Amino acid sequence: MSLSDHVQKLTSTLEQAKLVPGSAAALIPEGFQPTTKLEVSFANKDLDVGNFFRAGECKLAPSISFAAEEGAESGASYTLFLTDPDAPTPDNPQFAFWRHWVLPGLQPLSGGAVVAQTKPALTEFLGPGPKDDSKPHRYLFLLYREPQGLDLKKEDVGGEEFVQRRSWKPAEFAEKHGLKLVGVNWMTCAGDGWTE
């Protein structure tokens, strides 16, 4: 899928899921135009702007790929967020945004969408885990271009403990550290035992 097709599908699905406008409007401004297509794959099952996963399919960190932005500086680095706006449930998102993963120092390699990870995770990957009695949650993968010289530490993001990951403010974090949103993908996920 081309970047322009991806943008159209992304915009449409974010609106249908009431993310933009809606619960993620502070993170993804209305009218946002990605400058790269963020590709995410869990064990060879690709995210496709809002498709459905079971929690058991998402236990291991996914592969991430994206092409260099047109006109971006050589050696530009990017930070990835994975966050849940529906914690603990979509009907009661009192712990939104749940911080599942913060991965800085991603660099697209020349000639394709392969990405090098040049820095350790600021928040280690914790797979989606909605309870079986919860409606499916929406999970956002957000890719930000880092300003030159950005050197974040784990303490800048927050603790790794379960309760320390809740009620994170990703929009404030991005603004404070000069991160520029350039790519978005998202999925829905339910517990392995969830039934409609």
Give residue spans per PLM region.
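N-terminus-centered regions that define maturation/targeting leaders and the start
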Residues: M1-E196
